[in-house]
Amino acid sequence: GRYLAQAGDCKACHTDIDNDGIPFAGGRALKTPFGTIYSANLTPEDETGLGRWSREDFYNALNEGIDDEGRHLYPAMPYPYFTLMTRQQTDAIFAYLQSLEPVHVEEEENDLPFPLNIRMSVSGWKLLFFEDEEFEVDPDRSEAWNRGRFLVDGPLHCGGCHTGKNILGAGKDDEYLRGGTLENWFAPNIRGGENGGIAHWSEDDIFEFLKYGRAKHTAPMQRMGEVVSISTQFLEEKDLRSVATYLKSLDDTPREPEEAPDPAQ
């Protein structure tokens, strides 16, 4: 459970890092194009945390985006990715979180305009863009490739930053891992095959970057620095190399250059 929580980078979003917050106690302001959402308290505190949640409640949150009271969760919480995890895996994460010291925190109100401040509006978003699905192994691919795809598309939720979004904030299939934006930060194309954004990286380069935060070509910056320091550096070498195997299998197509606007217009 602890390992999966590290892979999912739960601590980064659920800690008010900017104000020296207590780990996993929530309160971090997540600025989205639609307003500000404050992360939840994941400690087992009864009033403001997960103290009264059951394993079933937690599974529903990660698998269906529904909280213990049946309310829809905003997709700033990456359940569209976490849904690939099994019940056994979510139960393990829950067991780890329940072992933390309970922390009572004052909950911040989300700052969202109408009608987005009404959680029922998320149901429409889910109908359009969310699919509760299980991970399916591709029998034609290696064990490492399948493990890498599970990690990338599931716990690591790489597409949350590195996939372009539509106007409603859902990932676009044709922009899968081709680069995206988050809080005015550009997350680059991480497809590693022919014409991909990291085509010039080797699998060793990807491993070194995720494990040690170093590479011949760049260093982790902004949110990616958090990902390495809080999440990927703690993952096993076998898993990180599986991620590299999967990313290096993703070819890309050159983008058509955008036409410059006519200065006379």
Where are these regions (language model features)?
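Detector for the c-type heme attachment site
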Residues: 13-19, 63-64, 98-99, 161-167, ...
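Sequence context surrounding c-type heme c attachment/ligation sites in exported
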Residues: 2-11, 145-159, 167-176, 201, ...
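Electron-transfer interface patches adjacent to heme c in soluble/periplasmic c-type cytochromes
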Residues: 29-59, 80-89, 175-216, 228-240
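The canonical Cys-X-X-Cys-His
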Residues: 1, 8-17, 58, 93, ...
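Extended, well-folded interaction surfaces typified by the phenylalanyl-tRNA synthetase beta subunit core
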Residues: 105-122
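Extended intrinsically disordered, low-complexity coil regions enriched in Ser, Thr, Gly, Ala
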Residues: 19, 52-57, 67-75, 164, ...
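A cross-kingdom marker for long, charged
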Residues: 217, 221-264
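Electrostatic cytochrome c docking/interface patches
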Residues: 1-6, 124-153, 259-265
